[in-house]
Amino acid sequence: MFTLSDFDFNLPPELIAQTALPERTASRLLEVDHTVEPARLVDRNFVELPSCIAPGDLLVFNDTRVLKARFFGQKASGGKIEVLIERVTGTHTALAQIRASKSPGTGTTLRLADAFDVTVGERVEPFFTLHFPQPCLTLIEQHGRLPLPPYIEHDADANDETRYQTVYASNPGAVAAPTAGLHFDLPLLEQLDAMGVERATLTLHVGAGTFQPVRVENIAEHRMHSEWYDLPQSLVDKIAATRARGGNVIAVGTTSMRALEAAARSADEAGRPLAATQAETDIFITPGYRFRVVDRLVTNFHLPKSTLLMLVSAFAGVETIRAAYRHAIDERYRFFSYGDAMLLTRRDTPEAPQA
């Protein structure tokens, strides 16, 4: 079996992108070409993406919108707290992480952003239920702060509020951006439309668990966080039409990939075709996984020892990803959320887990 150490690599800290580039499409794109063996690595700019895909292909985007989910506040006693909304569960309720010197008990009142009070409800490990006095999406948007990933060393500013959202974000609910989509601007989308590339969207609300480290050497023991997704019938129909004309299904980002593959795996297990799905998923994709829907993947460069690095290794092959990451480091690509992108093609046969 593969172990956690198989997905480690040394990354110079200066390659961790701290800010977005001035233009979304100014990022670089490392195309991994599987038509030759070993895979050929092609250095491109992201604006060249249309030349890498064909009319009739289908790009699948995640249209989730990042909430201003971070709050500072205090208890009635005056003790300071930090709150990160994990998920909106109802008009006036949400699950949240709370950092405090002492965990608040049920019924405790918390003052957030010196603007409104919430009441702590039942514990849903590792989260707390919070009850809001008004619709929580409204209060979150008005008074919250945009949460940036832990490896970005500055607090969110006005530029982040624009650039840490995709241009097509429409369904609020995430606490982290589907970052592969950050490279697309409206002119690029219009160019893809004009050349006959199809587009479709799904929704997966990215949770803070996306940054959760893997703490066990035997990765089979890792338990994934759960996220909610909505795969609409319109997307199911477009996938069928793409297959019929011989096109590729291209996931924009690992969140789109996880939603597509989760729905397809559930359909397989139920003995039925892919169908519209609204569900929770804790799908954990590692080498040996059999991909059912996605042919190609646009994705950023991921953290060492992360579940997302395991996912792309399962998709393109462990050695291919190792070679691509070595190349990216040598060529000074920018890493993580505000970094550069890769275009990967699915390995034809699943890679068996190591013995």
Curated annotation (Swiss-Prot):
* Lineage: superkingdom: Bacteria
> HAMAP family under this entry?
QueA
Entry's family note:
Belongs to the QueA family.
**Which species is the source of this protein?**
Burkholderia ambifaria (strain ATCC BAA-244 / DSM 16087 / CCUG 44356 / LMG 19182 / AMMD) (Burkholderia cepacia (strain AMMD))
Spell out the molecular function terms from Gene Ontology: S-adenosylmethionine:tRNA ribosyltransferase-isomerase activity
Job description of the protein: Transfers and isomerizes the ribose moiety from AdoMet to the 7-aminomethyl group of 7-deazaguanine (preQ1-tRNA) to give epoxyqueuosine (oQ-tRNA).
- Which keywords describe this protein according to UniProt? Cytoplasm, Queuosine biosynthesis, S-adenosyl-L-methionine, Transferase
Q: What is this protein called?
A: S-adenosylmethionine:tRNA ribosyltransferase-isomerase
Q: Which gene encodes it?
A: queA
- The residue range of the signal peptide is none
Q: Which GO cellular component terms are attached?
A: cytoplasm
Q: What Enzyme Commission number does this protein have?
A: 2.4.99.17
According to its UniProt record, this protein's enzyme class is: transferase
Compartments, as annotated in UniProt: Cytoplasm
Catalytic activities: 7-aminomethyl-7-carbaguanosine(34) in tRNA + S-adenosyl-L-methionine = epoxyqueuosine(34) in tRNA + adenine + L-methionine + 2 H(+)
Subcellular location, principal: cytoplasm
Pathway-wise, it operates in: tRNA modification; tRNA-queuosine biosynthesis
Subunit details for this protein?
Monomer.
